[in-house]
Amino acid sequence: MNLLASLAMIAAFSVAPVPRAMAADFYAGKTINFIAGTDTGGGFSIYARLIAKHLGRFISGNPTIVVKNMPGAGGSTAATYLYRAAPKDGTTILSVSPNAILGKLLDETQSQYDPTRFLYLAGAEHGTRLCMTFQHSKIRTYEDALAQKAIIGATSAGSPTREYAAWHKHATAAKFEIVSGYKGPPDLFIAMERGEIDGVCGLDWSALKSQQPEWLRQRKLNLLVQDSIESQPELAALGVPTPWRYIADDIDREAVALMVSFQQAFGKAYLAPPGVPAEQIKTLRNAFAGVLRDPELLADAEKLRIEIAAQSGEEIQRVVEAAYAAPRNVVERLKKIVEP
């Protein structure tokens, strides 16, 4: 997997020293709209609300931070708004799925924005995504999914739940029947519990620990596979395999590696629209660097059972640029295997 090194190495991070934010006069008395490009209850919304609770203290002028959810098209609705309509003055920031950023690489007509032109502020977590089934399902291991049909629920086109289920279906020959149209993780959880679906792919491990701690404690979930370049320690201890042993074709392995590496490196990233003055971008990057190592935020994260792994905005910017420089044959194959 020769793509792994370049993208995985970018995922390594260091947090810059945090001077007091500048531009106090600009942010004093202002409101920063913090948009989460998902429904409430999902991992991106949970992280956005946690960070918003503490972020204002790290910006001179102590602006009010208001979180607004803007779901749709796997995050592309919110990204389009940020790119085309949001104020370009540093008062609007976005938390969005990596799929909304990678989407234009897979379909140049898909989005109305150029992901390489966004101004990336920080990252809060390296995501490890999972395929799982509920306790009553006959599909208890990934080997079961290779041998018999599993009904896998998903949200909208372009979402991790749909694209991850699709590439598993095509690259490993998992017998997944994908049912799209669920509103978000809460609806998927209800569908699993009711037996409408066997399970779901593309959910984030850190968010799952916050959303369904009792299910995990009571072992109500069968964790089939962890979509990770290197095995996540907690999941490895639970015996959850990575997907690489199940992918026979070399180009398929490279295509899946491109998506998984990008998703893990990008994680929970935060961005501003192109055109925001450099002074405001510096202020926001410094603020994120500070808040993501703040003891109060980290204590709240522990209560929520979510992980914080800070990255700088500059590192996220390089992650995006590296993905868009990937070999065309790998990109073309990825385009095919993320469609159900």
Locate each region found by the language model.
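C-terminal segment of classical bacterial N-terminal signal peptides
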Residues: 10-21
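Boundary of Sec targeting at the N-terminus
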Residues: 22-24, 68
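An extracytoplasmic/periplasmic, membrane-proximal ligand-sensing/linker region
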Residues: 28-32, 217-219, 223-224, 246-248, ...
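Extracytoplasmic "Venus flytrap"
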Residues: 33-48, 71-74, 153-160
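Ligand-binding clamshell of periplasmic/extracellular solute-binding protein-like
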Residues: 51, 73-75, 90-103, 123-125, ...
